[in-house]
Amino acid sequence: MSQPIYKRILLKLSGEALQGDEGFGIDPSILDRMALEIKELVAMGVEVGVVLGGGNLFRGAKLAKAGMNRVVGDHMGMLATVMNGLAMRDALHRADVNAKLMSAFQLNGICDTYNWSEAIKMLREKRVVIFSAGTGSPFFTTDSAACLRGIEIEADVVLKATKVDGVYNCDPAKNADAVLYHQLNYADVIEHELQVMDLAAFTLARDHHMPIRVFNMGKPGALRRVILGEVEGTLICDQKLS
């Protein structure tokens, strides 16, 4: 049997991925499938950290444009990621996976407050650690939180799960001739203005040489193939374009 090429990963799941075709909220079947795919990684010996977005429940930036104070909106968005984290923890527990939910700010009685050394300890014990509430500060996206937590826990890679197969030279939804890149370096992404994640998050990953792999979580088995080093999605790292 093939062996994982990564020992420890940070998996970034968007809130939209959890809603499936529902358009809002959480699709239980999607949640359970993701939990089973994560369970498979744990069984392979991979240490898994997870960061969840909250866009399926709330988008602070969108309401800020409509007049809401941006700080208030972002705080509400952070709470949405905690709600998604609670749902993911429950799904993992139902799948017999030991999981711990941590929040960037105190939510006594609901989940633990983020503690770096405790998170490392639990990962080494093969417990899935779910990081919620983003970075704990407004104006930072959950992509920034994913890169930050990935760097802090010394993950081998940040895996960004999306609804597309990877990074294209243009929008595949608008152009049938869009080309999928299999590997890019950080400079390529900036030079060609490719949409991987927001610039603050991407720059953080680049400055700390944190590889990012973008893949389609909707494809059955895609996460497993990524972990085993098979050709899946787009890898962004220090190496040149290929």
Swiss-Prot record:
Annotated segments matching region Involved in allosteric activation by GTP: 20-25
Gene Ontology MF term list: ATP binding; UMP kinase activity
UniProt keyword terms in alphabetical order: Allosteric enzyme, ATP-binding, Cytoplasm, Kinase, Nucleotide-binding, Pyrimidine biosynthesis, Transferase
Gene Ontology biological-process annotations: 'de novo' CTP biosynthetic process; UDP biosynthetic process
Catalysed conversion reaction: UMP + ATP = UDP + ADP
Gene3D superfamilies named in the record: Acetylglutamate kinase-like (3.40.1160.10)
InterPro entries reported for this sequence: AceGlu_kinase-like_sf, Asp/Glu/Uridylate_kinase, Uridylate_kinase, Uridylate_kinase_bac
Compartments it resides in: Cytoplasm
SUPFAM superfamilies: Carbamate kinase-like
Pfam families, sorted: AA_kinase
GO CC terms in record: cytosol
Pathway participation: Pyrimidine metabolism; CTP biosynthesis via de novo pathway; UDP from UMP (UMPK route): step 1/1
Family per similarity comment: Belongs to the UMP kinase family.
Subunit annotation: Homohexamer.
Name recorded for this polypeptide: Uridylate kinase
Species whose genome carries this gene: Pasteurella multocida (strain Pm70)
